[in-house]
């Protein structure tokens, strides 16, 4: 598949796919292959704390944590993002716009590893976009999160240049 241009996997939800938990052996074997090919992996984020060993063991995989949820879970991701440069966060389908959580996230880790809605074809993004645009973020941070990070991460810059 890699020879045919496949560069990413996701959204992976190990406990739904029958692979056990994020730190289980089946999941590790899949990520070992992803690491061999430097793939991007989007995964469901119920338990960020279980991802630390996975992130450390697979430095060639770019992990995208989708819809990180409430402030407590976001704090777990912030801690991991500060330790692992190969972790990004996707805002799709999330309540991050409540209580200044997104602004806190940007303050803590910067806008360079945050994506807007790349894992969310199942819901109308107009309302989420309106909420996002109302946040007190710089135009540069908005641009990074809304499209620039995705263009770079998914290698799409050349498609629009």
Give the label of every model feature segment:
Residues 4-21:
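Active-site groove signature of glycoside hydrolases
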Residues 117-121, 125:
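C-terminal active-site rim and adjoining tail of enzyme catalytic domains
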Residues 1, 9, 34, 67, ...:
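Conserved, mostly hydrophobic/aromatic
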